[in-house]
């Protein structure tokens, strides 16, 4: 008898989502991060954005602790040559996000994953799970 193989869903968590998660503002964000049915990935650029964001209001120690926790909750994906090339293609196709957002999108696409975000730059893209918010 052949066993059934469970295919897990992979999500790339972007900076907006991590910020909302740690701020505790949007409960829908928690569903994706805390539900262990999903494989979570985070672009290494998201870590840079998180440190930059957190350093505005938090201590360096807190910023590093949060980045460490992100690394525990998700697989941190470095920017490979393939991701960089694909990101360039995303910009050519008209994606209006900045370079970091473009690399996050390419990270998801190269792994056949879905970006989880509420960032308006991503709204309407087919490989994005957009979280509506006020």
Question: What are the language-model segments listed below?
Answer:
Residues 2-9, 105, 109-134:
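Acidic, PIN/NYN-like endoribonuclease modules and their adjacent C-terminal/linker elements
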Residues 39, 75, 129-130:
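Conserved beta-strand segments of alpha/beta enzyme cores
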Residues 76-118:
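Active-site neighborhoods of divalent-metal-dependent phosphate/nucleic-acid chemistry enzymes
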Residues 13-16, 42-44, 96-98, 119, ...:
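Histidine- and aromatic-rich ligand-binding microenvironments
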Residues 17-18, 46, 83, 103-104, ...:
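Alpha-helix capping/helix-boundary segments
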Residues 1-42, 53-68:
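Short, well-structured N-terminal submotif of metal-dependent ribonuclease cores
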